[in-house]
Each structure stands twice: as C-alpha cells, then as structure tokens.
C-alpha cells in the first residue's frame, strides 16, 4: 500500500540532499550575481487534500514565473484526491537540467525505500570549473574551438519569418515513426551514437531547408565527467558546437564519421564554454539538438508505477531560437521542436518538422542508406514522399496495436 506520509519525508530528504535546490541568487558588492547555498529556503511539505475536480482546475495555474533574486527556485506540493496522490515539482532551469530530474527521481525512490541518498557535489563541481578556467588546457580548448568553429558564414537555424527580440514560446511535438530497436541497428550500421545520428539529421534538415551547405549547430552534453557528478543536481550541461560543410558527392557514412570525431573532441575540450561565450540573442543564436531518454518515463516507486500529468506553462519564454529535442522511450521516439514563436510562423516549423522526419525515415528505413551521398539523399526525399507517408502509417498502426 502506498504511504503518502512516507513519500513526503522522502521528498524532503531528497531535496535537502541537493544543494542546488537550496541555492539563491543575489548581488555582491560589485553588482555581480552570485549563488549561495541557503538551507533556510527549505519549507515543510504537507499533504493537501483536494477533489479531482478542483485539482483539474488548479493544475494549470501551478506553473508561474519565479522571482529570481533572493528567492527559492523550486516549488513542491503534494496533493491527495479521492482517486490518487500527486506530486507537483516545478524548478527553474538555472539550478536544474534533464539529468538532474533523473537523479532526483532516483533519490526519492531510494529514500522512500529506506536507502541512503548519495552525496551531491554541486558546489565542488562549480569550484572545479572555476579553477579550470585558469589552466593551460582551458586556453588550449579555447583555441581549438575558435580555430575550428569561428567565422560568420555558417547558418545555424532555419531562416526566421520575423526579426524581433520578442521571446514568445511555441512547441510542436509528434511521434517519429522510429523505434529504439531500429536505432540500435542504425548505431551499428553507421558506427555512431544516437546523439550523433540526430545531430547529423538536424544539420541536414537545416541545410536542405535553406539550400546552403555550411551549418553550425550546438548539441547538449550532460556535463557529468565522472561518477560523482552523475549524482549531482544542477545546471551542469554543456552546449557544444558541431559544424558541417556539405558537398553533394559526400558520402553519408563519411559525414557520420566526422560528426563522431567532432563530438569526442568537443567533450574533451568542454571545460571552455564556447557556445555560451559566442551566442547572443538574435545576432548569435544557434539551434540546439538534444537527444535524451524521455523524462516523462518516471519509472516506478517501490513497485508502483508513476504516471506523469502534463500541465500548462504560464508565461513561458523560448530558451533559444530553436531547440530540437528527440525523446526516447519504450513506446518509440518523439520529436519536440521548442521554438521562438515570435520569430517563426507555426507553418514554417511544421515544414521543417516534416523535413526532419523524412530525412530520419530515409536513413533508418531505406535499403542501402549507408551508401547514399548528400545528393542521393536529397533525390530520395524529392521522389519518395509516399515512402515517408507509408512508414508513418505503418508506425501508427503498430502503436495502436
């Protein structure tokens, strides 16, 4: 039987175990923003009894903007209805990332079952990163990135419909027509990781969409360099660059080999924040690619399956011009395009989404895809609209079954 008081205690212990969640931002004497650990930010979590009807109304007003200075940057509430128990957790991205969610959920489950929560090394990690900035390797990494990726003739996202500094949020999400098992075959065929595969698909889509060969994107590396950091909650991921200069006679397999090398070198030199130092809103935006396990697959708690409930984000802002997220789950893969709706018409993003899906479908399902050139891939896309529709139709039937 599920014990709600026991869950509340597990929640409180897990939150207290992660310093990033009890961190606040403030200004120092020089007017610089600093972050400080403040355990007094933790408040007691209580069980709130409410009806399913009232909770259904309340849930879409739970997510609201945070006060950023001298304030707690997470919210946690527990609700009990006549039907279920619900945990609401909202946290600002400045102290939390996708890996952090997995760590927190694992710790809640372990604490609920009476197991100890591993040590969190958040502030030690920040100190190590500060110290790294004063090393010779940091300077070597800066030179590596600048020599490899500097220049102003790259395209880094599909052409926008409107030029503005307004930052409204839009999203398109859909099933991809690809299973995790099929991706396993792709990894062996092209000798790339799933992350590298989708980075390449994204770059090809941007290039074909605008008709230009030189593309520079960023991709998300979780930033956890050792086992200790794998238990650490915080905004620790790194945005790393990757670039392409497509030629019509270039073999797709050779492109994948180059991407694999770039990804490995970028991780090696990830102590230098090249993308963060060079990306400016509007003038220096770079589309970002993220492949990850779908965080909505929350797993179970002491043998009881956890279900996630989507709720509305109020006053949401776009984090970048375009985030291309591929979410992998047991049910298949989902594509999510998070974009600046103040700069893109929805119809533009719908056309880009279809192109991304078609490139994926050809590379995954077409016979001899590993022998295609860039021109051959483009030809397949132009003549094979029916193939794409057939693949998506078959996948939809498979999902229903």
Give residue ranges: language-model regions.
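Extended, hydrophobic beta-loop-alpha segments that form or line the acyl/peptidyl-thioester binding
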Residues: 18, 22, 105-106, 213-220, ...
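Active-site-proximal acidic secondary-structure segment that organizes catalysis
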Residues: 79-123, 349-364
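Short amphipathic alpha-helices and their capping loops
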Residues: 8-53, 72, 121-170, 384-401
């Amino acid at each position: 039987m599920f014990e709600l008081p026991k869950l509340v205690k597990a929640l409180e212990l897990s939150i207290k175990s992660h310093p990033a969640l009890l961190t606040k931002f403030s200004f120092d004497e020089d007017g610089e923003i600093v972050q400080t650990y403040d355990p007094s930010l933790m408040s007691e979590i209580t069980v709130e009894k409410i009806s399913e009807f009232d909770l259904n109304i309340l849930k879409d007003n739970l997510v609201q903007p945070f006060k950023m200075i001298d304030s707690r940057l997470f919210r946690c509430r527990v609700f009990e209805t006549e039907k279920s128990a619900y945990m609401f957790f909202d946290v600002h991205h400045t102290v939390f990332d996708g890996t952090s969610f997995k760590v927190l959920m694992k710790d809640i489950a372990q604490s609920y079952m009476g197991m100890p929560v591993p040590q969190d090394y958040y502030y030690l990690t920040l100190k190590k990163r500060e110290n790294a900035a004063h090393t010779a390797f940091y300077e070597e990494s800066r030179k590596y990135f600048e020599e490899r990726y500097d220049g102003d003739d790259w395209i880094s996202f599909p052409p926008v419909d409107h030029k503005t500094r307004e930052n409204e949020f839009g999203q398109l999400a859909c099933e991809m027509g690809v299973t995790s098992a099929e991706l396993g075959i792709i990894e062996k065929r092209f000798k790339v990781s799933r992350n590298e595969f989708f980075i390449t698909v994204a770059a090809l889509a941007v290039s074909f969409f605008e008709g230009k060969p030189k593309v520079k994107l960023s991709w998300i590396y979780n930033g956890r360099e050792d086992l200790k950091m794998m238990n650490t909650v915080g905004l620790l991921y790194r945005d790393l660059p990757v670039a392409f200069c497509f030629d019509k006679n270039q073999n797709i397999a050779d492109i994948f080999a180059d991407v694999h090398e770039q990804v490995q070198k970028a991780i090696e030199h990830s102590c230098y924040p090249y993308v963060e130092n060079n990306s400016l809103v509007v003038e220096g935006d770079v589309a970002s690619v993220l492949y990850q396990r779908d965080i909505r697959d929350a797993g179970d708690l002491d043998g009881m399956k956890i279900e996630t409930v989507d709720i509305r984000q109020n006053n949401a802002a776009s984090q970048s011009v375009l985030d291309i997220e591929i979410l992998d789950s047991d049910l298949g893969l989902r594509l999510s395009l998070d974009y600046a709706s103040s700069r893109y018409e929805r119809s533009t993003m719908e056309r880009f989404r279809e192109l991304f899906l078609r490139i994926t479908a050809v590379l995954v399902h077409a016979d001899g895809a590993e022998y295609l050139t860039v021109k051959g891939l483009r030809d397949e896309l132009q003549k094979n609209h029916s193939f794409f529709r057939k693949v998506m139709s078959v996948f939809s039937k498979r999902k229903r079954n």
